[in-house]
């Protein structure tokens, strides 16, 4: 009896495109249509109730044992230790019982004299490798296959990471979780190798060492990616590229303070673009470094001490070498109080550097966007490089023509006045208009005051003439004719020299018609009285 020849089974699909081809599908997932929709709806409702927060919480509360005894004993021990600490602290600060004030000052002076007499400055012999300068030119890199190369000037990567994490102002619980992952061995190695790779790439190119470092960077990143729990991956790796970029930038500022002029905005932009592309495959937004809280690194170290300006340091050290009288001057004194030795120009520069500038957008419609096909096989070049380096198959980097798209900035808006500039100009114009309004208002008040004074003078003159009219009619008539003659002469002069009248003459011209109109009535009354 002949056995049937076994048929060769087809190979399983190794990529997303092969899977669609084997199923004769154009896209996936397919739309599922259920026959008994009511039964499926009941099943889905029961499933939602079973996996709800309340049901899971009640199940855990019922079945998971709770060890309250351990917590109670720990709390009691903490309270006991706290009481003991308070008791000992109170005894320590009872200075009247423990220290004699009269003897303390005499002993202090005696100890100071003893220390001053027998003081010898300590001399520490540094190896050639430990003696590093504070600039880019004096630093060299030596690759070690078995361990990471230490940072310049014996900087501690953990201290740098902690400094960067504290600038983010995380909550206490979030800070503790991120601190555990960021200070892990693979993350520390990632900072070391990324710093040295960027140092070689930017300042002292060496293709061989850069390739070795990049291999180790990929290893460290994949190890870190695997160690992060699944529920925290998205949140952590959304924050980590920016954190690593800030840590590398901080390391450059701490390692080479004399070369801080090289670490400008373009340096930060290139560094951030490189690290973001390594870890996520995407570039960050333009000007991402503006939200960093590292502006004081040029003048302050990560430990809070003030930096001595480079110009001041270069001027102090040669003077100590050539002038014998300044050899006793300690550089520590300058470090403690650099303002006492700095010039006013440096003080102005330090004050100007502290002035915070608020970012503002251009007055425009904003950047132009366009849709870009998302590459599912190249989200992280480091992970992809790691898989290729270890010759792991099943990696497809081809684009799916019907895949997911995401929005990308096509063109940034052209430079234009910002909204802050517009608001500042509007405030300035408003202030100028307010000043002009006050000036015009004051001038109108002065004109009204002048007109009232002229009106009062004319009224007084008329009252005086009317008072004299009852006493001596002939004298009043002569004075009145003189007054009219004077008014006619002034009016004639104004007509001849019109256009050159002063501000004081304008109110008189305004009042002259009124006065001339009233004078004929007075003359008529005077003639009637004379005839009578």
Swiss-Prot record:
Residues 432-482 form a coiled coil. Pfam families: FWWh. Residues 494-532 are annotated as: Disordered. InterPro entries: FAM227 (IPR029417). The gene is Fam227b. Belongs to the FAM227 family. The keyword Coiled coil applies. The keyword rRNA processing does not apply. The lineage of its organism: Eukaryota, Metazoa, Chordata, Craniata, Vertebrata. This is Protein FAM227B. Residues 500-523 have a biased composition (Low complexity). Keywords: Coiled coil. It comes from Mus musculus (Mouse).
């Amino acid at each position: 009896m002949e056995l049937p020849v076994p048929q060769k089974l087809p190979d399983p699909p190794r990529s997303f495109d092969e899977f669609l081809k084997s199923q004769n599908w154009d896209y996936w997932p397919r739309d599922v249509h259920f026959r008994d929709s009511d039964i499926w709806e009941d099943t889905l409702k029961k499933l939602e109730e079973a996996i709800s927060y309340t049901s899971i919480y009640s199940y855990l509360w019922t079945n998971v044992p709770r060890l309250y005894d351990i917590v109670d004993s720990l709390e009691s021990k903490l309270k006991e230790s706290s009481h003991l600490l308070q008791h000992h602290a109170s005894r320590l600060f009872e200075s009247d019982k423990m220290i004699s004030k009269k003897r303390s000052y005499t002993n202090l002076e005696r100890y100071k004299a003893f220390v001053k007499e027998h003081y010898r400055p300590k001399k520490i012999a540094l190896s050639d490798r430990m003696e590093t300068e504070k600039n880019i030119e004096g630093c060299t890199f030596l690759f070690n296959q078995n361990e990471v190369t230490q940072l310049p000037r014996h900087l501690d990567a953990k201290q740098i990471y902690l400094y960067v994490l504290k600038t983010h102002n995380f909550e206490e619980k979030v800070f503790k979780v991120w601190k555990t992952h960021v200070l892990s061995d693979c993350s520390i190695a990632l900072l070391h190798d990324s710093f040295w790779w960027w140092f070689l790439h930017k300042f002292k190119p060496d293709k061989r060492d850069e390739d070795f470092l990049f291999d180790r960077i990929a290893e460290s990143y994949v190890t870190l990616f695997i160690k992060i729990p699944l529920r925290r991956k998205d949140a952590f790796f959304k924050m980590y590229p920016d954190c690593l970029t800030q840590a590398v930038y901080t390391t450059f500022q701490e390692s080479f303070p004399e070369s801080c002029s090289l670490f400008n905005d373009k340096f930060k932009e290139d560094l951030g673009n490189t690290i973001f592309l390594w870890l996520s495959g995407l570039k960050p937004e333009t000007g991402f470094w503006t939200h960093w809280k590292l502006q004081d690194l040029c003048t302050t170290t990560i430990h809070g001490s003030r930096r001595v300006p480079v110009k001041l340091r270069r001027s102090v050290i040669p003077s100590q070498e050539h002038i014998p009288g300044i050899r006793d001057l300690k550089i520590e004194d300058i470090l403690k109080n650099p303002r006492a030795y700095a010039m006013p120009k440096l003080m102005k520069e330090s004050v100007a550097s502290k002035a915070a500038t608020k970012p503002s957008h251009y007055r425009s419609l904003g950047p132009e966007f366009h849709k870009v096909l998302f590459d599912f096989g190249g989200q992280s070049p480091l992970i992809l490089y790691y898989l290729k380096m270890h010759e792991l198959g099943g990696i497809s980097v081809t684009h799916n023509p019907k895949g997911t798209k995401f929005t990308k900035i096509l063109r940034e808006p052209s430079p234009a006045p910002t909204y802050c500039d517009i608001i500042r100009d509007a405030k300035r114009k408003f202030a100028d208009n307010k000043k002009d309004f006050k000036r015009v208002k004051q001038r109108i008040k002065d004109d009204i005051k002048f007109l009232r004074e002229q009106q009062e003078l004319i009224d007084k003159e008329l009252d005086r003439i009317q008072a004299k009219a009852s006493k001596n009619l002939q004298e009043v008539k002569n004075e009145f004719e003189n007054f009219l003659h004077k008014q006619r002469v002034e009016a004639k002069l104004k007509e001849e020299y019109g256009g050159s009248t002063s501000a004081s003459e304008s109110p008189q011209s305004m009042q002259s018609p009124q006065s001339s109109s009233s004078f004929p009535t007075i003359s008529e009354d005077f003639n009637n009285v004379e005839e009578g």
